[in-house]
Amino acid sequence: HTAYRRQRQMCIRDRNYCMLNKKDFLKYASTLAFPIMLQNLIGTLVNIADTVMLGYVSQTAMSASSLANQYTFILFCLYYGMATGTSVLCAQYWGKGDKKTVEKILGLAERISLIISLIFFVISFTMPTAIMKIFTNSPDTIAAGSEYLKVISFSFLFMGFSQIFMSSLRSIGKIMLPSVTYIVSLCVNVLCNASFIFGLFGLPKLGVTGVALGTVIARISE
């Protein structure tokens, strides 16, 4: 009887411990999940802001940027795959306390992303018209999209670095810096877009080129 009572007390204690652990886990997971959701939302809004604000320029400009961003989306998918793989490896070795390996993994990923960025940059900067002809046969849309794509291609050189680096930071539990970075990037993008579209602060009205330039500035600040 005494052994049974002792075993029952141990079971109750273990169950309470598991419940506490579950609560702690859910609390910790929520503190990580919400900022990451916010970061992804803001990162998407940076691209959406271009399209929405181009609606104030013309429907042609808005259509051109949307089609040009299809090319950018391909690059973003490559970044996303690399960032996901890098973050998994970084989290694994960070948990082991092997910071040197984490640095090597991050360095290798950044070098690969730079090579990919350079390839996409060269193609979009030298052949923007050929890229736009894949998505449309409208001369006006091709002209506006080519202008937009040629300028925004400079953002590729910075976007890969930030995407992989911030994904790696999230994987080791450092979520504040990526959150602040994305918020600053969104604010800079909207401010620059408005300035170049409406000619604020004495700046020239650059239309579709101005929106692309605003995105480049936002990516540099990011």
Tell me the role of every PLM-derived stretch.
Residues K22, L26-L45, A49, Y71-L78, ...:
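Residue-level signal for short hydrophobic patches within transmembrane helices
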Residues I119-K150, F198:
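Short membrane-interface helical motifs at transmembrane helix boundaries
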Residues I36, T44, Q70-F73, L108, ...:
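Residue-level recognition of pore/gate-forming positions within transmembrane alpha-helices
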Residues M62-F125, M159-P178:
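Small-residue-rich hydrophobic transmembrane alpha-helices
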Residues L41, L45-S63, M132-P139, S195-L206:
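Helix-terminus/linker motif at the lipid-water interface of multi-pass membrane proteins
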Residues H1-D14:
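Single conserved hydrophobic/aromatic residue that forms the stacking wall/gate
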